[in-house]
């Protein structure tokens, strides 16, 4: 029997769990939960997109400032590590359209460097932050792992390349790898200030400040928004699951439900007290129309079930931004 996500993950002699992109939204959340459970954690971030303020509360973690595009940095952070949670990336479709080369360096090159270092250091398992963007704009819903990927943005191409590298390293070198294809993750600590931020973070900041948010397109596009606690839960399950069940696998990570951006705006209007209407602008290059995950594979392999639904997650998110002064 494997460990559950609520049990200690265990340690090798040197006892490190590495979180890449630890100053980012998802990486910070995973590290915080590991520390809460008494685990020994090492984190790395280059602060290209990560925020130093996100390291507050993680003082028990060993932190290394470095760039995974540098192979030497990867060697340093993988020493003595058993499990890697690889969250570092330039996680933005619009940014990848503006800077495809930078996206490739910080997603593909960085991932390959990390995998080589992990293999050489004897790391047991790498859990990878995949992306639903690899499915592209195919009309079939829900998205299943058996569907042929059809990436339509440089970011999606980069994340898919990472998936293939992970699977190759498992098959060729025996490095255990698990890919979780995230669907529109949101929650506390997500940066609401950048043009490249997630839509819910931007909406929360603007609506709490009484500013008009912008919907790109007609607003009838839909997303399977996934609250951060569900993603952290899934990562811990993926780290603890028996090798025979998950090594070399990739699976969707979402709630299995979708909502349009127009309906999302209405929920946020209720939660924030915003009285205006959204602005509408032309669709952005690289954006997909609809997104909905089939999560049955994660349910079967990990025992995963969403632990926080969309509306409750959005309520918690709004309250966090309100308390943190996002207005």
Positions of predicted regions on the chain:
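N-terminal Rossmann-like NAD(P)+-binding domain of SDR-like oxidoreductases, especially those catalyzing
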Residues: 1-185, 308, 324
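C-terminal substrate-binding subdomain of Rossmann-fold SDR/epimerase-dehydratase oxidoreductases
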Residues: 6-9, 207-327
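Surface-exposed alpha-helical interface segments used for non-catalytic interactions
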Residues: 28, 32, 109-112, 164, ...
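A structural alpha-helix within SAM-dependent methyltransferase catalytic domains
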Residues: 35, 115-119, 167, 204, ...
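Conserved donor sugar-nucleotide recognition element shared by glycan-biosynthetic enzymes
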Residues: 154, 162, 196, 261, ...
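Hydrophobic alpha-helix immediately C-terminal to the catalytic Tyr-X-X-X-Lys motif of short-chain
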Residues: 161, 165, 169, 199, ...
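Conserved catalytic loops of nucleotide-sugar-dependent glycosyltransferases that act on lipid-linked
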Residues: 192, 196-199
């Amino acid at each position: 029997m494997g460990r559950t996500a609520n049990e200690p993950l265990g340690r090798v002699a040197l006892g490190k769990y590495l979180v890449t992109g630890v100053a980012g939204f998802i990486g910070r959340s995973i590290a915080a939960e590991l520390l809460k459970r008494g685990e020994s954690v090492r984190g790395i971030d280059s602060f290209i997109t990560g925020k130093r303020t996100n390291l507050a509360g993680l003082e028990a973690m060993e932190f290394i400032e470095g760039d995974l595009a540098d192979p030497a940095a990867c060697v340093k952070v993988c020493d003595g590590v058993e499990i890697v949670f690889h969250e570092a990336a330039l996680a933005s479709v619009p940014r990848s359209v503006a800077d495809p080369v930078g996206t490739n360096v910080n997603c593909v090159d960085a991932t390959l460097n990390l995998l080589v270092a992990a293999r050489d250091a004897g790391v047991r398992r790498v859990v990878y932050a995949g992306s639903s963007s690899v499915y592209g704009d195919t009309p079939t819903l829900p998205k299943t792992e058996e569907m042929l990927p059809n990436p339509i943005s440089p970011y999606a191409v980069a994340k898919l390349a990472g998936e293939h590298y992970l699977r190759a390293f498992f098959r060729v070198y025996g490095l255990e790898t698990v890919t979780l294809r995230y669907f529109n993750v949101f929650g506390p600590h997500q940066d609401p200030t950048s043009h490249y931020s997630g839509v819910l973070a931007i909406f929360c900041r603007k609506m709490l400040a009484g500013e008009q948010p912008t919907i790109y397109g007609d607003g009838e596009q839909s997303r399977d928004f996934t609250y951060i606690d569900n993603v952290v839960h899934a990562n811990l399950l993926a780290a603890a699951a028996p090798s025979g069940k998950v090594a070399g696998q990739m699976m969707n990570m979402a709630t299995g439900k979708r909502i349009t951006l127009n309906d999302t705006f209405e929920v946020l209007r209720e939660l924030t007290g915003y009285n205006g209407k959204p602005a509408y602008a032309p669709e952005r290059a690289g954006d997909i129309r609809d997104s909905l995950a089939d999560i049955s594979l994660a349910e079967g392999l990990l025992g995963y079930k969403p632990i926080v639904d969309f509306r409750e997650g959005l309520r918690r998110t709004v309250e966090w931004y309100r308390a943190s002064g996002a207005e």
